[in-house]
Amino acid sequence: MSRRLRRTKIVTTLGPATDRDNNLEKVIAAGANVVRMNFSHGSPEDHKMRADKVREIAAKLGRHVAILGDLQGPKIRVSTFKEGKVFLNIGDKFLLDANLGKGEGDKEKVGIDYKGLPADVVPGDILLLDDGRVQLKVLEVQGMKVFTEVTVGGPLSNNKGINKLGGGLSAEALTEKDKADIQTAALIGVDYLAVSFPRCGEDLNYARRLARDAGCDAKIVAKVERAEAVCDQNAMDDIILASDVVMVARGDLGVEIGDPELVGIQKALIRRARQLNRAVITATQMMESMITNPMPTRAEVMDVANAVLDGTDAVMLSAETAAGQYPSETVAAMARVCLGAEKIPSINVSKHRLDVQFDNVEEAIAMSAMYAANHLKGVTAIITMTESGRTALMTSRISSGLPIFAMSRHERTLNLTALYRGVTPVHFDSAADGVVAAHEAVNLLRDKGYLVSGDLVIVTQGDVMSTVGSTNTTRILTVE
């Protein structure tokens, strides 16, 4: 097999396109590492069926594929129109009325499903409808009515989203539907659970408590899509530290903070998440044109490549695989771009946290292993023998061109590490401990074709294989 492994992972969204023509198997075979189930669409039965199919195919192909359940979150939308759609011109007066019923909207007014909107806005605020395609300036608020003037005109149809420029809408991050979907996530046994529109760390802590109460021990993903989540370093850190994974959800975030600010925020989020030992997913419109075209645009290629250069763990596909005409081709194209970007030498340079003091032995071992790996001539791989996947995560926070093999007896741990940049999960179960187990792990990787005789490898492990958090040893071994 090729000695070169793709380091950046691919998250693919399931939907009607992956339900037909054996596309799900094709998508996983093409390189999907994580599948996303969007709880905004479909029934619990649909999600359970898809999850079962993913696990069946992954086992058949000998892959470890993580399952991510994505909660819908609060959807702040206009209601519906009598004719289904209206066209608003610049200068038109337009009323958002929280008391107006469904199907009563027209060119002068429409209902809103978020009844707290009038309390969240003041004259002068800019409301962005349909991802900013239509923009309204608030003139006055009277009771449950928000009087506005159209500043950017265009068509407006049923159930389009509402954002406030600069953020500040106070809708709670978890709805009753989300709480029901957490039960579904627990039933399915998702590996990751994504929380939409969190305002602060406490929203994520609340989601984690609800998940635990439901019997779901999934890692929590913070979808960063509100302006207040990135308004300063403290707000950003609050979100990151309360999560296990950060998703740079560029759609709603870009609408709220403005597209020109998005580039810097993406880079800052990725950099800070890595510093705080969190994984990162970069999402939204990464290969949007491939919904209907068999090849990506040059701009999309550059977007994916730049996310790789930023240090993201994973790049995500949404409608491209859920509803597109070329789901497996899109995954294959994204994989090629990732591999191309990973050839650039600068992404393997690391400062190794030389100015940081570590809080625990596990992190110290992970960092020392990576320092040795990047500075000892001839090292070809890092092997982390792990119960929880934590050591694999921490080693992957340090930039390196070397593969990291997460070796565990636990299927869930292997699925979790499928998301981490540069980490290849490999099932390994041994009754031995210490150096005997280390040699067994090295021999297994050699037999699988990942290593060859004479390779120099670095192994991290604990004294006892079955104890979580016990990593305390680094070994340097030569493959026999």
From Swiss-Prot:
K(+) binds at residues 38, 40, 70. GO terms for cellular component: cytoplasm; cytosol. Its cofactor is Mg(2+); K(+). The record marks 223 as: Transition state stabilizer. It catalyses: pyruvate + ATP = phosphoenolpyruvate + ADP + H(+). Keywords: Allosteric enzyme, ATP-binding, Glycolysis, Kinase, Magnesium, Metal-binding, Nucleotide-binding, Pyruvate, Transferase. Pathway: Carbohydrate degradation; glycolysis; pyruvate from D-glyceraldehyde 3-phosphate: step 5/5. Optimum pH is 4.0-6.8. Its EC number is 2.7.1.40. It is an enzyme of class 2 (transferase). Disulfide bonds: none annotated. Coiled coil: none annotated. It comes from the Bacteria. Mg(2+) binds at residues 225, 252. Catalyzes the formation of pyruvate in the last step of glycolysis, it is irreversible under physiological conditions. The reaction is critical for the control of metabolic flux in the second part of glycolysis. Homotetramer. Belongs to the pyruvate kinase family. This is Pyruvate kinase II. It comes from Salmonella typhimurium (strain LT2 / SGSC1412 / ATCC 700720). The gene is pykA.
